[in-house]
Amino acid sequence: MMDLPTIISWVGTVIGIILNLSPAVLFYNIHLGKEKYTNIPETMLIFNILCSSLWACYWYLQEDKFVPFFSAMAGLGLSEIFSLLYLYYFSGKCLKKYLLFALLEINLVIEFNYVLIRIIGDYSMVGNIAVVVNILTYIAPGQNIIKVCKEKNYRLIPIASTLSGASCALSWLLFGILIKDIHTIIPNSLGLIFAAINSFTWAYFYCNRDKNDDEENGQKELITPEKEEI
């Protein structure tokens, strides 16, 4: 029978995998031509790859930490897949250029993990680096909150992703508390705080929104231009 930390870590793993699948919608829209390529999602994916690599090595260097290791590896695998898909569009769908970029990225990921495990080899040191990099990933959400406050537009906050992220952070925070792992507690505490700030900001501007603007936007979405007969 599984103990409580293991159950909670599996919950966090499932939520984390769902969150890591979220770029699929963006890539589908890019494939259909509904959205254009930008560097921002690729930058976020690179940060995710870096973070996942660090956490995977952190848990690998410890004993009996299969579930968090599996969670980190799942995040690394999904982020790598989406990143490689993004490189395909970045290379202008040129196969030779794409293969060059793809092999370079995969090689860098392998070498980075090799350095963490074989050269550093100390899980505490790897954990310290992981915490710092994890904290840096909150810069983008922080800038988005500032933008929301300036424009007073609650739609800029993806509330579904925010709540899912909060659930994931809460799961791993509880896991970290139960196993008394400070490297897990710090980033997930900050993640939960950022998610709470995002949620309160969204709720505030949603409750104080201009309902007339909402009605106009809704009407614009319903109105579709008629096709001209040829």
Segment roles from a protein language model:
Residues 1-230:
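Alpha-helical membrane-protein topology signature
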